[in-house]
Every structure is written in structure tokens, then in C-alpha cells.
Amino acid sequence: MATRSPSVVISDDEPGYDLDLFCIPNHYAEDLEKVFIPHGLIMDRTERLARDVMKEMGGHHIVALCVLKGGYKFFADLLDYIKALNRNSDRSIPMTVDFIRLKSYCNDQSTGDIKVIGGDDLSTLTGKNVLIVEDIIDTGKTMQTLLSLVKQHNPKMVKVASLLVKRTPRSVGYRPDFVGFEIPDKFVVGYALDYNEYFRDLNHVCVISETGKAKYKA
């Protein structure tokens, strides 16, 4: 049985932090309930994940595959930490990047209908160590679909890093190899996670309010 990937577990009754304790853009002041994961904590956890990735995958050229759009902030910060490790290590490895865009959400619900609406030719992944970087695993269906697409091209290794994994009864049971935080079944935004394209410009991961859902509903 595979070992469960470690993560920072945020409990169901976690109260979060008052918005007025942090710098929040004024245009979102009424649209959020609370700050759930402050930006500094995200960065510290991401730094450790970079070390874990290098320890497990650092023996061979890595292709880092970013799942757009929500994964781009985590992707950029994770790669910055990996590059820093590369610069300061006797054993550095080459790394290239690629991008794919998937869509499975309308409003705050994962539709289960996975659309690949961007990305380069995945045949370039053949024989490579592939690190897929995602913002959040909700039901897990999106990632299972992407993994099946990637594995058709016979990569040497495929690992998945996700900033967040949601505890939800809708989960198919999939868990990535590298996990930042395990969170309750709440719809979170910020740090590039969106609600119908809004809130990507927040630094912190926050819980959206009912007012925010109504205002930005598709």
C-alpha cells in the first residue's frame, strides 16, 4: 500500500483569520468571509515541497507541466524554489516547462465534464520525468483524466504536486504525490484560484462569501 503523501491538514472547524488582519484589495472587501491560508504560510510550505520534489525526482531531466489557469502562481513559486535548490546543489538537473489548460468548473461546482482547451503536444513528454503542477484537487476526476492523457505518451515517470486537496464526499479517492494543504469542503479563492475568473489577484487563500458568489456568478 502506498504511503499517504504528507500535508498540512486544516481541520473542518478551522476559524481562519479576520480580513482586517491582512492586506486585502478593497474591491473584494465584501466578497470574502475570511483569510484561510496566509500567503507567507503558502510560500513556506511550497519551499518544503520543492525539496521533496527534488529528492524524489532530481535524478533526471524534469518536465514541469503547469495546469492553467489556477496553477500558475503555485507553479511559478514552486519552480523558483526548485531553481534555488539547483543553484546551490552539487547535483543540479535540467528542467523545462510546458502548459496545459483544462476546464471543469462553472460557478463553485466541478462539472465532471473535463475540457482540454489548451496545451502543447503531449508527445514531447515521452521518456521524461513529468511533474504535473495543479492548484487544487477537488473530486480528483480532472487529474485522473489528465493523467490518462499524459500516460498515453509513455513518460518515464509522472508525479503530481497540488497546493490544495479538498476533503469532500465527492472525491473519487485520488491523492497526488506532493500536497501542500488538505482543506475542508469549502470553496476557496485567491493565490490564482478563481471564481469565474475573479479573485486570482489575491495573495492569500480565502473563503468566498455568499455575497461574493452572488456578485460574480456566471
Swiss-Prot record:
Pathway: Purine metabolism; IMP biosynthesis via salvage pathway; IMP from hypoxanthine: step 1/1
Catalytic activity, as annotated: IMP + diphosphate = hypoxanthine + 5-phospho-alpha-D-ribose 1-diphosphate; GMP + diphosphate = guanine + 5-phospho-alpha-D-ribose 1-diphosphate
Bound cofactor: record note: Binds 2 magnesium ions per subunit. The magnesium ions are essentially bound to the substrate and have few direct interactions with the protein.
Annotated Mg(2+) binding sites: 194
Gene name of the record: HPRT1
Function as written in the Swiss-Prot or TrEMBL entry: Converts guanine to guanosine monophosphate, and hypoxanthine to inosine monophosphate. Transfers the 5-phosphoribosyl group from 5-phosphoribosylpyrophosphate onto the purine. Plays a central role in the generation of purine nucleotides through the purine salvage pathway.
Superkingdom of source: Eukaryota
Subunit and partners: Homotetramer.
Name of protein: Hypoxanthine-guanine phosphoribosyltransferase
Any one biological process term the GO annotation gives: GMP salvage
Compartments reported by the entry: Cytoplasm
Modified positions (N-acetylalanine) in chain numbering: 2
EC number: 2.4.2.8
Keywords: Acetylation, Cytoplasm, Glycosyltransferase, Isopeptide bond, Magnesium, Metal-binding, Nucleotide-binding, Phosphoprotein, Purine salvage, Transferase, Ubl conjugation
Modified residues (N6-acetyllysine): 103
Keyword flag Transferase: yes
Enzyme class: transferase
